[in-house]
Amino acid sequence: MKHVLFGFLLFFTGTISYAQTANTASCSSSKQLKEGVSSGKIEVILPSHLTPEDVASYAKYYEPFFFVDFNSKNHTATFQMVSNTAESRRVILRFLSANQIQTITVDGKSYQLQDFYQNFLEK
């Protein structure tokens, strides 16, 4: 009986811990990100568990706003904006959310998606 209770406790603890893990993407630097926003070619390093199929399956819905080129070797997604406006760049947040990404790290600082947009993509 002791082993069964311990097994359940271990299972539920692991499940809760896994469910609370935030998926985080990152950007090389704020300078590179700002240059990307200006040029309409924004690079984001996605979590390693995302596959090219995952990225492609979500990217197809956002083609009116941007195209996504995904390098599976270094997990870098390059967003090529169709129309480089703040409104179109906001749609990147939908793509990231669809891929279960909740935060983005830039220069060692972690940003929630809305804060990331306000600090980097909106300008």
Language-model features: where?
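Short, exposed beta-strand/loop patches in secreted or surface proteins that constitute
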Residues: 34-35, 67-70
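Short amphipathic beta-strand starts and helix->beta connectors
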Residues: 24-30, 59-66
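Short glycine-/aliphatic-rich beta-strand segments at the starts of folded cytosolic domains
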Residues: 27-48
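Bacterial Sec-dependent N-terminal signal peptides
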Residues: 1-25
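Short amphipathic alpha-helix segments
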Residues: 43-64
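Surface-exposed, polar helix/loop patches in the mature regions of secreted/periplasmic/lumenal proteins
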Residues: 80-123
